[in-house]
Amino acid sequence: PAGVSVSDILFPLDAVKDFSHIILVEGLFDVLKLHELGYTNSLCIFGTQNFTPIKAKILDEYGCRKVTILMDGDNAGKQASQKIQKLLEQRNIETVTVTLPKDLDPGDFNEEAAEYFLGKLKENF
């Protein structure tokens, strides 16, 4: 819609309204892959520069109490993880950061990779 910035959008926000634990990923293909693998509590932030205080507020208002930060394994992903963690902790939302190897992103996950990086978290969803 006109006047809406990608910086204001979390996708697919309505799909996670019943979860108190959310997984945040960078891109659309990342979130689609995680949903395909059964991690339906995942949201896309549309790029490392696009997590804002507005998005932290939205998650807080949706009742999110814990966030797993799952950015790509590159430097931009690592820097974004730190920024996201600070913004969420200002709203008293617990965070866990999963650090991926340099050349891996969640969109590349198969079932084994998802289980390796996220399996221990799934029981808390």
What function would you assign to each model-found segment?
Residues F46-F51, D72-G73, P101:
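Short, acidic/turn-prone active-site loops that include or flank metal/cofactor-
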Residues I23-L24, D60, R65-L70, S81-F125:
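Replication-associated primase and helicase/ATPase modules
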Residues P1-K66, A80-S81:
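Phosphate-handling DNA/RNA-contact segment within nucleic-acid enzymes
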